[in-house]
Amino acid sequence: MGVTGNVYKFLLVLHIACVILGFGATAFNGLYLDRARRKGGREGATLLEANGDASRVAEFFVYAVFVLGILLVATSKSAWKFSQGWLSAALALYFIDLGVLHGFVRRLQKRYDQVAAQLTEMTGPLSSSDDRPSQVGVLEQLEQRLQLGWGIFNVLFLIILYLMVFKPGA
């Protein structure tokens, strides 16, 4: 096998495809959130629902990135080792990134969806800013925190990508 073998190359193609499909699909979630807020109402809720569905599928590709990465190390015939600093750092950052996704972003997204659904159910025009439902303020705070979470997720991904491409110290 080794890094020049067909099995390694096939796994590498799958690994890269999963990176593109998984992380690429989630890279613009902050933008979708902003767009849904601007659309508002049922249209915004529909946009968020579709984005949520796509993101849940993308997460499986994000998980596959890890599995395929482990297989790449195993089939590299010692070209890559878990003791190499860049690889250990990339793995640690991957798990931190998953922690941001599940412990921060998904938790906030669930709350955001609940509040947005409550707000969508409200009917009748608002006559002044004093009539603004409290849910609007809550949504704005949640949106800011979600934007921060997605930003952190994306920055961590870019650092991991840098480590994978340039392999500092290898």
Sequence positions of predicted segments:
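Polytopic transmembrane helical bundles with strong interfacial aromatic enrichment
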Residues: 1-170
